[in-house]
Amino acid sequence: MHVKKGDRVVVLSGREKGREGVIKLSLPKKERVVVENVNIVKKHVKPMGNRQGGILEVEAALHVSKVMLICPACGKPSRTGHRVNDEGKKVRVCKQCNADVA
């Protein structure tokens, strides 16, 4: 996947289009990510044991194709590429400013 946990992203499409947030959880097998304060849905929870039931607001997962990384160097949404750095490690690279993405 082109984004990882902790990356700042912008939502490209849907009702949350244009919203920015940080990735809380990455689900590579399902190709989905959970972004903080984006795609809030209401979840109905039954009371179990000590926990009280009710309606909770939680962040639902978005498909990874609906988000784009915001480059930490240039601050713009951009696609990412890969290259091998001087130490022989594979790193992500911003396609706009050609800077390494941590």
UniProtKB/Swiss-Prot annotation:
CDD domains: KOW_RPL26. This is Large ribosomal subunit protein uL24. Belongs to the universal ribosomal protein uL24 family. It comes from the Bacteria. One of its GO terms (cellular component) is ribonucleoprotein complex. GO terms for molecular function: rRNA binding; structural constituent of ribosome. NCBIfam families: rplX_bact (TIGR01079). Keywords: Ribonucleoprotein, Ribosomal protein, RNA-binding, rRNA-binding. Part of the 50S ribosomal subunit. GO terms for biological process: translation. Gene3D superfamilies: 2.30.30.30. Pfam families: KOW, ribosomal_L24. One of two assembly initiator proteins, it binds directly to the 5'-end of the 23S rRNA, where it nucleates assembly of the 50S subunit. One of the proteins that surrounds the polypeptide exit tunnel on the outside of the subunit.
